[in-house]
């Protein structure tokens, strides 16, 4: 899978490191020469120093072969413009970082549906840590209509009981348990 990331700040570099560790083929774009030099020296990826809102530069990355284009700069306008340009190359997956949540509607108005705000995401995660301190991991589904979470149950009312005796209820369904360190999906 071929992924192009525009922006080599904290978000872009962190994402690049994770994707490289997972074995993905990356091209990284930034207009800051020192960030480009640092990334080129440290990462197993093609690094192009230039403006990601330039069509000719995007063509140099073989944008038409990309499976993903991810705009991670802290500049919403640059992210928006690059995503608009990338759409003409039929990249199947376009993701944009938005710094100002008020700008999210502008991205959606031009068909960029995958818009992420690291600040809002972090705030939501922190809120979950406060409101659900026993939850080890949490996945929200859809628009937050449902959630899957991993938690340790210490309530004497349910510990040691059969799953069919306590689930489903109107509030939850148990979909798996750990027994002796192994994941067990009930029948």
Q: Regions from the language model: what does each represent?
A:
Residues 1-187:
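Cytosolic regulatory regions of ion transport systems
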């Amino acid at each position: 899978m071929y992924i192009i990331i525009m922006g080599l700040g904290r978000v872009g570099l962190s994402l690049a490191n994770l994707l490289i560790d997972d074995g993905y083929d990356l091209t990284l774009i930034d207009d800051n020469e020192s960030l480009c030099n640092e990334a080129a020296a440290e990462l197993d990826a093609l690094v192009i120093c230039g403006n990601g809102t330039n069509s000719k530069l995007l063509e140099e990355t073989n944008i038409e072969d990309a499976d993903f284009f991810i705009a991670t700069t802290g500049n919403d306008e640059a992210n928006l413009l690059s995503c608009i340009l990338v759409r003409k190359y039929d990249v199947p997956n376009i993701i944009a970082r938005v710094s100002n949540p008020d700008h999210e509607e502008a991205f959606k108005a031009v068909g960029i549906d995958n818009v992420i705000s690291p600040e809002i995401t972090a705030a939501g995660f922190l809120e979950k840590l406060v409101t659900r301190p026993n939850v080890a991991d949490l996945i929200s589904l859809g628009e937050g209509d449902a959630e899957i979470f991993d938690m340790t149950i210490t309530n004497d009312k349910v510990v040691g009981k059969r799953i069919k005796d306590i689930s489903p209820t109107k509030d939850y369904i148990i979909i798996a348990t750990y027994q002796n360190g192994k994941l067990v999906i009930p029948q």
